[in-house]
A protein has these predicted regions:
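Core beta-strand elements of the Rossmann-like FAD/NAD(P) dinucleotide-binding domain
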Residues: 23-32, 149-158, 200
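Glycine-rich active-site/cofactor-binding loop and its immediate structural neighborhood
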Residues: 16-44, 57, 62
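FAD-site-proximal beta/loop scaffold in flavoenzymes
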Residues: 51-66, 153, 158-217
Length: 217
């Protein structure tokens, strides 16, 4: 271990703003508390989402074999980024988007130019709802989507669910002692001091995905 560092390989949750309790019941107090619990992928609730061929951006870069056919689920920057990466490396990529445009946070004119160029590299399927993911009895899966009442099927080696991430603040029971906003993000001020009822908690700070909507993953 590191000098002056005690390591507890357990889950823990807050019992007050400066004290956490581990799974084994031990309470740990700190005058200074740094919350850096990260985030987790949010998966659509459809049949087959738990199949081993379905990955998130936590696991997609650890593939042992390169997929020849990839379905990417998602509308945002992460979905577009991985669609570009895998298509540039030679995979046939289908990006399945529930809404009528991708990159909704980006200026529409920029998105239109991006889609025009990207469409030459991979397939962007707008206004498609994910119905289910089925195993095919081999290593592939069939992704079933719906568009205007019509069912479409795509056979793929791998599915990437890039459908958003959520802060892990709920696993810490943080909302009892700190401000928690949409998708579980802990409230902070410009100095990354955690807030409670809008005011900084003395000695409390948050780092990384647990407080920021701009996810590092």
């Amino acid at each position: 271990g590191l000098p002056n560092v005690d390591y507890y390989p357990e889950y823990a949750h807050f019992v007050d703003a400066h004290t956490v309790q581990t799974e084994s019941g031990q309470k740990l107090y700190g005058r200074q508390v740094v919350i850096a619990a990260g985030s987790r992928a949010v998966l659509p609730a459809v049949p087959g989402i738990d199949l081993p061929q379905v990955h998130t951006n936590d696991t997609i870069m650890r593939l042992e074999e390169f997929p020849q056919r990839l379905v990417v689920l998602g509308v945002g920057v992460v979905a577009a980024e991985f669609s570009h990466v895998f298509s540039a490396l030679g995979a046939q990529v289908y990006q399945v988007v529930r809404s009528n445009r991708i990159l909704r946070e980006v200026d529409k004119e920029v998105v239109d130019r991006f889609v025009e160029a990207a469409s030459h590299q991979w397939n962007i399927l707008l206004e498609r709802s994910l119905v289910e993911i089925r195993e095919n009895g081999d290593v592939t899966v069939t992704v079933v989507i719906e568009h205007d009442g019509q069912v479409e099927e795509i056979v793929a080696d791998i599915v990437l669910a890039a459908t958003g991430r959520r802060s892990n603040s709920d696993t810490l029971k943080a909302s009892s002692f700190f401000d928690v906003y949409s998708r579980g993000f802990i409230g902070t001020d410009k100095y990354q001091r955690v807030l409670y009822n809008g005011s900084p908690v003395p000695g409390g700070f948050a780092l990384g995905d647990v407080f920021s909507p701009f996810q590092l993953k």
